[in-house]
């Protein structure tokens, strides 16, 4: 059997990176699609400002639940990556669009939670998928995917900055992007020359890993960083919108669009 060429010479590696980066860019817009139009939802359902953050928080909770379930069920090894990604993206697109059918905040939060669950099959699998195409430059490839999904999360704010883009256009644009991501991966992705061997979930290793001081410190640092980052991403757009309204009460929709454009730039910068 002829060994595969080294990853810095494989002819299809950059195509795979471009395809997965574009898929993440399109698919991750589901995350903040509710937050981008939170002021409109608040006016529609008459909930307090304290509840606005839940439109994003429940997505994160759903993502955590979905990731944990995926790990326990070993989905990344049981289900082919292309299928897992595509089905998750389609499910997320549907759950996100169904928010438009909600008549009150609790129903919307349920759909947003399910959206987060589905995103657990869009974000983590893509990192494993691209790693099968790279070895020496794996860090560059994974970093590119993370950068693409970061910009993708910010896209709903860019859509909201377009004149006339309210709740339905922003929500449906995010769902359409996720469907596009599913189509890209389903039709265009193939596993790379460096696949990972399937491994069952090993309960016996949980205590061993959790007992490692370096793992605990690294995990605590990562959790703290993510807490800070997502709190800032949720707070900043609301802060910008409130600042514009306080500075120029007559700005109206134009000021809201300007705040969304700045929010997009800030979130996309990471």
Mark where each language-model region is.
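Cytoplasmic helix-loop-helix junction between adjacent transmembrane helices
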Residues: 111-148
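Helix-loop-helix hairpin linking two adjacent transmembrane segments in secondary transporters
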Residues: 136, 144-189
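Central cavity-lining transmembrane alpha-helices of secondary-active solute carriers
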Residues: 57-73, 264-270
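Conserved MFS/SLC helix-loop-helix module at the cytosolic interface between two early adjacent transmembrane helices
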Residues: 67-106
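Short hydrophobic/alpha-helical segments at membrane-entry points of transmembrane helices
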Residues: 104-112, 217-218
């Amino acid at each position: 059997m002829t060994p595969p060429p080294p990853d810095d010479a494989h002819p299809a590696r950059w195509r795979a990176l471009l395809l997965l980066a574009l898929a993440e860019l399109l698919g991750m817009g589901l995350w903040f699609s509710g937050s981008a139009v939170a002021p409109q939802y608040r006016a529609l359902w008459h909930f307090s400002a304290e509840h606005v953050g839940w439109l994003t928080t429940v997505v994160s909770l759903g993502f955590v639940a979905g990731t944990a379930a995926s790990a326990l069920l070993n989905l990344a090894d049981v289900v082919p990556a292309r299928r897992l990604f595509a089905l998750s993206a389609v499910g997320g697109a549907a759950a996100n669009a169904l928010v438009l059918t909600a008549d009150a905040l609790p129903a919307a939060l349920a759909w947003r939670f399910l959206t987060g669950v589905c995103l657990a099959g869009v974000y983590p699998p893509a990192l494993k998928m691209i790693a099968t195409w790279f070895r020496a430059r794996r860090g560059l490839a994974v970093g590119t995917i993370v950068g693409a999904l970061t910009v993708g999360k910010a896209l709903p704010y860019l859509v909201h900055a377009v004149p006339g883009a309210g709740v339905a256009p922003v929500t449906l644009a995010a769902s359409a992007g996720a469907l596009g991501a599913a189509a890209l991966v389903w039709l265009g992705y193939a596993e790379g020359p460096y696949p990972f061997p399937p491994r069952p979930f090993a309960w016996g290793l949980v205590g061993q890993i959790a007992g490692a001081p370096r793992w605990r410190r690294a995990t605590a640092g990562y959790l703290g960083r993510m807490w800070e980052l997502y709190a800032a991403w949720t707070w900043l757009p609301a802060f910008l919108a409130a600042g514009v309204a306080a500075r120029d009460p007559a700005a109206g929709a134009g000021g809201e669009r300007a705040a969304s454009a700045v929010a997009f730039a800030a979130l996309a910068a990471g």
